[in-house]
């Protein structure tokens, strides 16, 4: 009785042990400790989708952040040239690290990029107003280039434009310095620190005249203001004007004759005797 009972207990224990897995069949990666075979089996059958790993990043990234991140590393879309890449990012306002918005505009201007619906002329105007210039172009060159194409500063009339360029000595194409002087004289412009009288004198010496003014009118106008020709004394001035019949203001012909008689002047084809008579 006791023996049969003891045998039954042994058989029961043996069946329980045989049901357990062999623990030395599965060990950890470093070989230091066994892994439960049930857990190992579960791990072998678990399938992890890589897309699921990217589906929930630590910090969600919007499309703009994605574009920026790839732009900084130089990635581009398929069939997209480096120039296309630059253009695409320029239109969305991205910039290189340590690059100000002004630097961005300059960089794209030099490569000829422009804003949407902006003509080349609009591009030039936009950059002129902000003071950008072409390579190896001085500020004076910049002014000249824009003057020739008719651009002007804000709140500047065409007359203001002409004056500004006249003071710096610019001229129109196929226009000589004399043509420049004439054009500005007719519109009343003058040189810096030059009075209206200085202006008249300068133009008188070079023979310029006012519109609808004959050479005689020119002589009269200058005589009344006391101007004279180069290397001409006051006496020479009086003689020249006497012979042509000019007189001083508020002076009668008799006064004119008296003045010239006292100084010994005479009319052409008149002898000293005729003068005395």
From Swiss-Prot:
Residues 1-19 form the signal peptide. Pathway: Secondary metabolite biosynthesis. Residues 20-69, 76-88, 95-107, 114-126, 133-145, 152-164, 171-183, 190-202, 209-221, 228-240, 247-259, 266-277 form a propeptide. Disruption phenotype: Abolishes the production of asperipin-2a. Keywords: Signal. AprA is processed by kexin proteases to produce 11 identical copies of the hexapeptide Phe-Tyr-Tyr-Thr-Gly-Tyr, that is further modified aprY and aprR to yield asperipin-2a. The bicyclic structure of asperipin-2a is likely synthesized by the single ustYa family oxidase aprY. The reductase aprR may be required for the final reduction to yield asperipin-2a. Ribosomally synthesized cyclic peptide asperipin-2a precursor; part of the gene cluster that mediates the biosynthesis of the asperipin-2a, a bicyclic peptide that possesses two macrocyclic ether rings consisting of 14- and 17-membered paracyclophans. The aprA translated product contains a 11-fold repeated peptide embedding the hexapeptide Phe-Tyr-Tyr-Thr-Gly-Tyr, that is converted into asperipin-2a. After being excised from the precursor peptide by kexin proteases, the core peptides are cyclized and modified post-translationally by enzymes encoded within the corresponding gene cluster. This is Ribosomally synthesized cyclic peptide asperipin-2a precursor aprA. It comes from Aspergillus flavus (strain ATCC 200026 / FGSC A1120 / IAM 13836 / NRRL 3357 / JCM 12722 / SRRC 167).
